[in-house]
Amino acid sequence: PTARAHTASHYPVSMPAQAYLGKECVCQLRKGICDQSCVQDMLQTPFYIACLRLSGRRCVVVGGGEVGLEKVEGLLVCDGDVTLIAPEADPELTQLALEGSIRWEQREYETGDLDGALIAIAATDDTDLNIRVFNDAEERAMLVNVVDVPPLCNFILPAIVRTGPLAVAISTAGASPALAKRMKREIGELFGEPYAVLAILLNDARGWAKATLPTYQDRKQFFESIVNGDPDPIELLRAGDAQAVRALIEDAQRAYAPV
């Protein structure tokens, strides 16, 4: 349907895991009544860290508040095909729908909304709805995340530091998003633009390395000689001397080229 401008009087926010205490257990432990055991269990979970290519893939966000906006924006950055399910939405989400950046289904969630989707994210203050989205996604073997409720997630969203082509993910296994945000800020200050520029310059040399150096080990040594070289390419870039880094790469190419 066509998106309609609507200023919501209440923006749903995600429910913390504590909201499930005393309710029927919905996690993999199936304890009957929730006692929060699974929250502690999440800290022991060996998560498989991966980067997903979302370009053109359908991603569903349920919930039109500030948290939903945050998740929608994260998916759009990665070129996801985003559908928002919410009877009301934050004004910024409304604008994204009006400009065609997302599809807004302005109504309550329905089970069929997940058909054909890769990812579902529930960002509402309705515990029963969050559980329903989780169960529907699990039945479809989909990736699903109920914001701030780790037991109702089969993947968690790390805090991301993005600088050019670089992306650094910080995860606390759902234990403390606040700590992850602090780490994100500090890592962003430490690994700034010079690292992004170096990544671009090294990527420019990848074609030469693949065409010229016969083995993986040869290519590994070539790139490590630049990254860990003397002078330090990061320090050169901090001084604004990208040309000196290009010279380092050219010197390494001459040194590693087969005779």
Predicted regions span which residues?
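An accessory alpha-helical subdomain
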Residues: 174-259
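E1/E1-like adenylate-forming module used to activate ubiquitin-like modifiers
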Residues: 125, 146-196
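Residue-level detector of alpha-helix initiation sites
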Residues: 66-67, 127-128, 174
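Cysteine-centered motifs
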Residues: 25-27, 34, 38
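Glycine-rich, highly charged phosphate/nucleotide-binding loops
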Residues: 97-115
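Extreme N-terminal basic, low-complexity initiation segments
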Residues: 1-15
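Hydrophobic, well-ordered beta-alpha structural blocks that scaffold small-molecule cofactor pockets
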Residues: 38-88, 93-96
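ADP-ribose/adenylate-binding Rossmann-like module
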Residues: 119-124, 130-157
